[in-house]
Amino acid sequence: MRLIRRIRAFVPGLIAAQILLGSGVVASADSASANSSVAKSQTRIVLAGGCFWGMEAVFEQLKGVTNVVAGYAGGDASTARYEMVSTGSTGHAESIEVTYDPSRVSFGQLLAVYFLVAHDPTELDQQGPDEGSQYRSEIYYTTTSQKNAAESYIQALTAQKTFDAKIVTRIEPLRAFYPAEEYHQHFVARNPDYPYVVINDLPKLAALKRKFPDMLKS
């Protein structure tokens, strides 16, 4: 576990250097707008559940999902940078902003993938080898209907005893979402052989194909 954490911690410097060599520019969360432009026919939800690499990779596979952005939620703009968020002291959670078309994929379907594939909702301030409040399980809703649906879904999972342990997922209104640095975006797709990805994220994609094959993009 310690080795895996060190592998992930090494990524910013490694990939940032690659980006610098390739384009001369590294995107900053501070330079990105906290509010996404979403078409009227679409809506968005922000989900936190451990490392945003795997979360992003899972939701990018779904029909009706038009965009997924890795980023930070739950904290302030001034500290929405990976080197600060990774300390676990800024109040942020590594998150993804999912933009989707409700006529093609329901919020309930997104919740099913979130709870049953993308992360373990019973782990408090931790997901797999990653520990700290920045890896917490949290849903940031943008509408009251999302809030009510998320609460009902958790109640149903609890009543059905889907998990052996208590679900610790928090549900909070979205105050702001800050896109992460460019080297974090689409990380799994660009680095499928990276050790952390192979160990922690590819199994999630395999589980998604096994559990929800009809929800996948062709």
Briefly describe each language-model feature range.
Residues 2-8, 12-218:
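Flexible coil/turn and secondary-structure edge motifs
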